[in-house]
């Protein structure tokens, strides 16, 4: 940390605080959505968080033509003002305004990540250090953010958690305003070329079995994430008035992800042992989460679920990185980013359409299909490695 240059420190401090606020406010928003007594509003909260991701792959065209630091600065200011404004909205009233404000906030937020990644690439010698520190800060921020939200709720006001998120965005904007980078506009591809790149990513996914499997994994996990998020308010009711439970379940995201990241090297890549762990954990944890009336069991199930999701996420990314040409990987991840946003939204809507038993049956079929496809791909990977070894001999 001491070796980082000022620009790198400002970016890291601002983003750690901002991320902390994100995971402090998520359960708070789910709690506020329950005051509308309509689960379509709860699903709407998840949808307006995820649907803007569909457009993120095409925003690099605009980001490359503008000052990235200013994009980050004004995005955080807009988000901060909106979240502070949400605290003045009466509970349970004006649902469309509630969702519209969230959509504007998260919609503006999709400009932030491409700009942040571009700024990070300008940090030269610090780029490896800040990427490593950012990954560590992400997990810690989820845990601390959820804990802070829980404390605000115990203090008597869920609105404080929402206000805290607004403040973290404004503090992040302050740090970003201190970043001193020379603005150099880049004439990147136009919108038509961006769509062409997107189509090339789709073509690679369809013709490369390994990349297709990675995409299948990411889409499956996104649907599962949407389902789990939508059930947070229901499961939380098994603990007191249900509000503090949302923060405890959000804490599980960070805790489970931390354990999952640590288990990746032990479970391995492209082998049936890790695949079996992922499949069993995904199905069993979701079944427990959806059907148990005991909150302590739900917490354990949530931790197991997020362990599986972290493992699956790493596996999917590595599968793309190992089996696709470097120049096409960005296009593949662009397609993945858009698909993930759409699938989280779809998963969150299922609670309003079918009951838990039907959702669980769908999940079992989906994860089982992924298991079979991955097993075939792992076999191909093993055969390819054996052939490569024989050639070298």
Curated annotation (Swiss-Prot):
Matching SUPFAM superfamilies: MFS general substrate transporter (SSF103473)
Alphabetized UniProt keyword annotations: Cell membrane, Membrane, Transmembrane, Transmembrane helix, Transport
Signal peptide from the UniProt entry: none
Topology versus the membrane: Multi-pass membrane protein
Cross-referenced Pfam families: MFS_1
Recorded GO CC terms: plasma membrane
Parts of the chain that traverse the membrane: 11-31, 43-63, 69-89, 92-112, 133-155, 160-177, 215-235, 244-264, 287-307, 353-373
InterPro entries in the cross-refs: Bacilysin_exporter_BacE_put, MFS, MFS_trans_sf
Superkingdom to which the source organism belongs: Bacteria
UniProt xrefs under Gene3D superfamilies: MFS general substrate transporter like domains
Membrane found in the keyword field: yes
GO molecular function: transmembrane transporter activity
Location(s) in or outside the cell: Cell membrane
Function per UniProt: Part of the bacilysin biosynthesis operon. May be involved in self-resistance to bacilysin by permitting efflux of this antibiotic.
Family, as annotated: Belongs to the major facilitator superfamily.
Official protein name in the record: Putative bacilysin exporter BacE
């Amino acid at each position: 940390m001491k070796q980082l240059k000022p620009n790198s420190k400002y970016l890291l401090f601002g983003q750690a605080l901002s991320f902390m606020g994100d995971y402090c406010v998520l359960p708070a928003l789910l709690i506020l959505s329950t005051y509308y007594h309509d689960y379509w509003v709860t699903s709407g909260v998840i949808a307006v968080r995820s649907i803007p991701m569909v457009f993120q792959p095409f925003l690099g065209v605009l980001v490359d033509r503008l000052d990235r630091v200013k994009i980050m600065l004004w995005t955080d200011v807009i988000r901060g003002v909106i979240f502070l404004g949400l605290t003045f909205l009466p509970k349970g009233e004006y649902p469309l305004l509630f969702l519209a404000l969230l959509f504007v906030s998260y919609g503006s937020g999709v400009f932030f990540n491409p700009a942040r990644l571009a700024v990070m690439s300008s940090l030269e010698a610090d780029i490896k250090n800040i990427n490593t520190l950012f990954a560590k800060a992400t997990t810690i921020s989820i845990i601390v953010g959820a804990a802070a939200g829980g404390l605000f709720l115990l203090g008597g006001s869920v609105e404080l958690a929402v206000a805290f998120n607004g403040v973290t965005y404004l503090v992040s904007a302050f740090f970003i305003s201190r970043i001193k980078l020379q603005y150099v506009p880049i004439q990147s591809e136009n919108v038509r070329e961006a769509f062409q790149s997107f189509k090339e990513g789709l073509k690679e996914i369809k013709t490369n079995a390994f990349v297709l499997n990675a995409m299948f994994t990411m889409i499956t996990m996104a649907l599962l994430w949407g389902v789990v998020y939508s059930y947070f308010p229901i499961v939380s009711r098994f603990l007191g008035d249900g509000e503090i439970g949302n923060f405890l379940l959000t804490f599980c995201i960070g805790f489970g992800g931390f354990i999952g990241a640590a288990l990746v090297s032990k479970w391995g890549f492209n082998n049936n042992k890790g695949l079996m762990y992922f499949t069993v954990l995904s199905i069993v944890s979701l079944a427990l989460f959806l059907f148990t009336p005991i909150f302590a069991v739900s917490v354990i199930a949530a931790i197991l679920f997020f362990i599986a999701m972290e493992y699956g996420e790493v596996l999917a990314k590595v599968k793309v990185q190992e089996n696709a040409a470097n120049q096409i990987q960005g296009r593949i991840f662009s397609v993945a980013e858009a698909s993930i946003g759409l699938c989280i939204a779809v998963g969150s809507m299922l609670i309003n359409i079918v009951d838990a038993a039907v959702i669980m049956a769908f999940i079992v079929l989906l994860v089982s299909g992924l298991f079979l496809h991955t097993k075939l791909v792992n076999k191909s990977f093993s055969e390819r490695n054996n052939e490569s070894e024989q050639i070298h001999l």
